[in-house]
Amino acid sequence: MAKKVVKVVKLQIPAGKANPAPPVGPALGQAGVNIMGFCKEFNARTADQAGLIIPVEISVYEDRSFTFITKTPPAAVLLKKAAGIESGSGEPNRNKVATVKRDKVREIAETKMPDLNAADVEAAMRMVEGTARSMGIVIED
């Protein structure tokens, strides 16, 4: 019989930088998970993606064991990296902070495809372009 899931914890942690300090420690401590075990495993799995924020979904079972799934980084994080900016615009409709080429948007959309609810790459690109627009980033051909 399959183990029963007691709790699902969703976090966004910088790749390779999980440690028992907040927010990781308290979230997993409440679920009774071995925090250091998770941190070591997460850091090993995400070591090659340094500098990105990785969403992770941790399933905690009755016997306090756990499994976790890492997702692709948020589109906003990938767009900021592509544009080379620290943060998006405070007033995206007035202040544009950067420009990104359409082929870079396609690259981000292809990276995000497994996690997006899109039928094809074009639909995924439109989602990423919408995120860019709301951050004050201009898309150019």
Swiss-Prot record:
Specify whether RNA-binding is a keyword of the entry: yes
Q: Which SMART domains does UniProt cross-reference here? A: RL11
Q: How is the protein altered post-translationally, as described in the entry?
A: One or more lysine residues are methylated.
Q: Which domain of life does this protein belong to?
A: Bacteria
Q: How does it assemble?
A: Part of the ribosomal stalk of the 50S ribosomal subunit. Interacts with L10 and the large rRNA to form the base of the stalk. L10 forms an elongated spine to which 2 L12 dimers bind in a sequential fashion forming a pentameric L10(L12)2(L12)2 complex. In stalled/isolated 50S subunits interacts with RqcH.
Spell out the HAMAP family in the cross-references: Ribosomal_uL11 (MF_00736)
Please report the name of this protein according to its UniProt entry: Large ribosomal subunit protein uL11
Q: Which organism is it from?
A: Bacillus subtilis (strain 168)
